[in-house]
């Protein structure tokens, strides 16, 4: 029987990413794991609905044996079986992030025995999670360059706290994974400001994009009033398309926060990204660790190595025979991954 990997959910930033990465890697490598202290670093520790949905989705896709899969649980034991392609549908039952559930199971389906379609119902535009737009416009184009055939479609927008959204991804097994090198982003080609409004007055979006335009006069502007009963909700994004990649910065309107304050938050994040010579933003850096590790090669630059990034690297190195090296130079950090020496 494979050795059980023991993981401390309180390590590093102590959030749900440790669990999601462990589930992905366990399915792919066939190595079981035990985790204690799940989300110990959070105000409400243990499994929330979104995390529980990710566990149950992983369980269904690989026929795993699992203990501890209940709301509030801080311990989990997961013993995977073979990954099975097919049609899957999961409902979070709250506004928890569809994207984080998808990102847990999709890497395993890159290695499935056939094509798959995964549909998840819940939140599509959440704070502290990649939005559906980020997945479609930023992450998946980079995966395609690595040889991964995956396409996500936003079925319906879902905002916190109501949820009610849905997204579906069609994924084909990858024949092989290529590394990716993102050292410089190159020249900025296009900038687009977009406000999404669901049961929120149109003038809110107009004020948001007008404020962003003051920071980025060259930005194209787009205000989208969503229909179909989703909401209330408001998301403002700034998409920066460069020669080597696309980045997306998002902030969410909340009661008591002005449209101008939301726009200034997006502008601050985007300006901080553009002020650094690094190619990759802080959140995208987190999303690249797992695919690059599975490819066994690659490199990118990021302005700083966040606790989230370092925690994710530590988990990946427990499951895969790879080594990450981080080097600081010229006001940024270069992250490199390589396969471990077979003799080491």
Swiss-Prot record:
It is an enzyme of class 6 (ligase). Its main location: cytoplasm. GO terms for biological process: RNA processing. The active site is at 308 (tele-amp-histidine intermediate). Its EC number is 6.5.1.4. It catalyses: a 3'-end 3'-phospho-ribonucleotide-RNA + ATP = a 3'-end 2',3'-cyclophospho-ribonucleotide-RNA + AMP + diphosphate. CDD domains: RNA_Cyclase_Class_II (cd00874). ATP binds at residues 103, 283-287. Keywords: ATP-binding, Cytoplasm, Ligase, Nucleotide-binding. It is found in: Cytoplasm. The keyword Ligase applies. InterPro entries: RNA3'-term_phos_cycl_insert, RNA3'_phos_cyclase_dom, RNA3'_phos_cyclase_dom_sf, RNA3'_term_phos_cyc, RNA3'_term_phos_cyc_type_1, RNA3'P_cycl/enolpyr_Trfase_a/b, RPTC_insert. Pfam families: RTC, RTC_insert. PANTHER family: RNA 3' TERMINAL PHOSPHATE CYCLASE, RNA 3'-TERMINAL PHOSPHATE CYCLASE. Belongs to the RNA 3'-terminal cyclase family. Type 1 subfamily. Catalyzes the conversion of 3'-phosphate to a 2',3'-cyclic phosphodiester at the end of RNA. The mechanism of action of the enzyme occurs in 3 steps: (A) adenylation of the enzyme by ATP; (B) transfer of adenylate to an RNA-N3'P to produce RNA-N3'PP5'A; (C) and attack of the adjacent 2'-hydroxyl on the 3'-phosphorus in the diester linkage to produce the cyclic end product. The biological role of this enzyme is unknown but it is likely to function in some aspects of cellular RNA processing. This is RNA 3'-terminal phosphate cyclase. It comes from Salmonella paratyphi C (strain RKS4594). The gene is rtcA.
